[in-house]
C-alpha cells in the first residue's frame, strides 16, 4: 500500500493539473471502488473549483469552492495519471505504457484548463468520498490520526509522550497511525535503521521515567524526517503498483538500506553485519541485528 512519500508524490503531480482549475466533467465508470460511490458525487463536483490539494497521512484532500472536501485514497493498486494534449483534446499528450489497460480506469476528471485526470485501480481498494465542512472532523478515516511526521509539531517530545508506557515494540508503535500518521512498513524499517534502533525494542524506551524524550527519540525523529524527505525527492518507492502522475516509476527502492535486502551486507559505515528478516505482527521486518540495538 502506498505510504506517505508515494501519496505526497501523487499530490505534487496532481496539483498543477487540478489546483485552481474548475471541474467541468466527472465520470464514474462504475458504482463502487472499495465502497459504493455517493449517488450525488458528480453533482457536487461538477462546476466546483479545486481551491487546493492537500494530504493527511495517506489520504488526498481536494478542497472545493463549495466548501466540500473530496477525500481520496489510493488503496493497494490505485494510481492517477494526468493527460494533457492529444489525449485530452489538445496537442502534446503524454502517458506511460503501464496505463494502457483502460479497463481499470474507473474515475475521470475533466478540468477547465484542459487536463484530464484519470484514476486507475485494478484491485479496487481505493476510494473517494465527498465531505461537507461539518463532516470532516468526524470522518472515521481521518479522526484520531497522529501528527504529520514532516510537520512542525512532530518532535522528540511528542513521540516520547505517545510512546511512554507502551509495552509494544518500537516498530508496532510507529505503524500505529494514532502515534504518527502516514508511516508504513517500508519507511518504518528504513527509519529504524537510520536511527540504529532495533524494531524489537520497547516503544516505552523512547521516554525517561518522567516522560522526557531520550536521545533515542531525538535520533528516531531525525531519521524519520530524513528518510521521508529522501523518498519524496526520489518520487517514492515503486515495488508493485506505485507510479507518479506522469506514469514514471519512483526510484527510492534503489536506495533501501534494509528493506527487501535480506542476506545482503549492512550499509552502515563500519558495520560488517548482514540484513536479516523476521515476521513481526504479520509483516516482514528487515534490520541489521549487529548495529540496531
UniProtKB/Swiss-Prot annotation:
Involved in base excision repair of DNA damaged by oxidation or by mutagenic agents. Acts as a DNA glycosylase that recognizes and removes damaged bases. Has a preference for oxidized purines, such as 7,8-dihydro-8-oxoguanine (8-oxoG). Has AP (apurinic/apyrimidinic) lyase activity and introduces nicks in the DNA strand. Cleaves the DNA backbone by beta-delta elimination to generate a single-strand break at the site of the removed base with both 3'- and 5'-phosphates. Monomer. Belongs to the FPG family. It comes from Rhodopseudomonas palustris (strain BisB18). The lineage of its organism: Bacteria, Pseudomonadati, Pseudomonadota, Alphaproteobacteria, Hyphomicrobiales. A zinc finger (FPG-type) spans 257-293. NCBIfam families: fpg, PRK01103.1. Keywords: DNA damage, DNA repair, DNA-binding, Glycosidase, Hydrolase, Lyase, Metal-binding, Multifunctional enzyme, Zinc, Zinc-finger. Its cofactor is Zn(2+). GO terms for molecular function: 8-oxo-7,8-dihydroguanine DNA N-glycosylase activity; class I DNA-(apurinic or apyrimidinic site) endonuclease activity; damaged DNA binding; zinc ion binding. SUPFAM superfamilies: Glucocorticoid receptor-like (DNA-binding domain), N-terminal domain of MutM-like DNA repair proteins, S13-like H2TH domain. Pfam families: Fapy_DNA_glyco, H2TH, zf-FPG_IleRS. It catalyses: Hydrolysis of DNA containing ring-opened 7-methylguanine residues, releasing 2,6-diamino-4-hydroxy-5-(N-methyl)formamidopyrimidine; 2'-deoxyribonucleotide-(2'-deoxyribose 5'-phosphate)-2'-deoxyribonucleotide-DNA = a 3'-end 2'-deoxyribonucleotide-(2,3-dehydro-2,3-deoxyribose 5'-phosphate)-DNA + a 5'-end 5'-phospho-2'-deoxyribonucleoside-DNA + H(+). Binds 1 zinc ion per subunit. One of its GO terms (biological process) is base-excision repair. InterPro entries: DNA_glyclase/AP_lyase_DNA-bd, Formamido-pyr_DNA_Glyclase, FPG_cat, MutM-like_N-ter, Ribosomal_uS13-like_H2TH, Znf_DNA_glyclase/AP_lyase, Znf_FPG/IleRS. This is Formamidopyrimidine-DNA glycosylase. DNA binds at residues 104, 123, 166. The active site is at residues 2-3, 58, 283. It comes from the Bacteria. Signal peptide: none annotated. Transmembrane segments: none annotated.
